[in-house]
Amino acid sequence: MSSLTHLTSHGEAVMVDVSDKAETERVAIAEARVVMRMETLELALSGNAEKGDVVATARIAGIMAAKKTHELIPLCHPLLLTKVGVDLEPDPSLPGFRVQALAKVKGQTGVEMEALTAVSVACLTLYDMLKAVDRFMRIEGIGLLEKQGGKSGSWKREKE
């Protein structure tokens, strides 16, 4: 098992020094689900939710969150993101939304935290905008699906 990169040999927290690492294109994709009642999903898709366009607002919130990841997660490097995308797919079989976020950068460190932050905040925004009608919603399965680039190369989660 690898050692923890954000701790010194004395257990003190540090931001990892990436100055000697090569700049490479890096991509990360994260996913999550928001499970809700079917009536809540229908309301979200109708565009008639009291707080407005639920899907568009959650998408923008996720993108904004990715850009602020370094302000939210201690020791995260600020990155010049080259792309952030958030997709919210309605899934009646849940019922709810399947949410995916993609983050890209040409840099010296990965974008996993940015993709995870984007998907998390998009889900939290769905929850916030719909909680008045459905207090039983659940956010589930937040995780990294895939990463590409950097010294460790590509990684993809196997189907469960």
Swiss-Prot record:
It comes from the Bacteria. Keywords: Lyase, Molybdenum cofactor biosynthesis. Substrate binds at residues 75-77, 113-114. InterPro entries: MoaC (IPR023045), MoaC_bact/euk (IPR047594), MoaC_sf (IPR036522), MoCo_biosynth_MoaA/MoaC (IPR050105), Mopterin_CF_biosynth-C_dom (IPR002820). Its EC number is 4.6.1.17. The active site is at residue 128. NCBIfam families: moaC, PRK09364.1. The lineage of its organism: Bacteria, Pseudomonadati, Pseudomonadota, Alphaproteobacteria, Hyphomicrobiales. GO terms for molecular function: cyclic pyranopterin monophosphate synthase activity. Belongs to the MoaC family. Homohexamer; trimer of dimers. Disulfide bonds: none annotated. It comes from Beijerinckia indica subsp. indica (strain ATCC 9039 / DSM 1715 / NCIMB 8712). SUPFAM superfamilies: Molybdenum cofactor biosynthesis protein C, MoaC (SSF55040). This is Cyclic pyranopterin monophosphate synthase. Pathway: Cofactor biosynthesis; molybdopterin biosynthesis. Catalyzes the conversion of (8S)-3',8-cyclo-7,8-dihydroguanosine 5'-triphosphate to cyclic pyranopterin monophosphate (cPMP). One of its GO terms (biological process) is Mo-molybdopterin cofactor biosynthetic process. It is an enzyme of class 4 (lyase). It catalyses: (8S)-3',8-cyclo-7,8-dihydroguanosine 5'-triphosphate = cyclic pyranopterin phosphate + diphosphate.
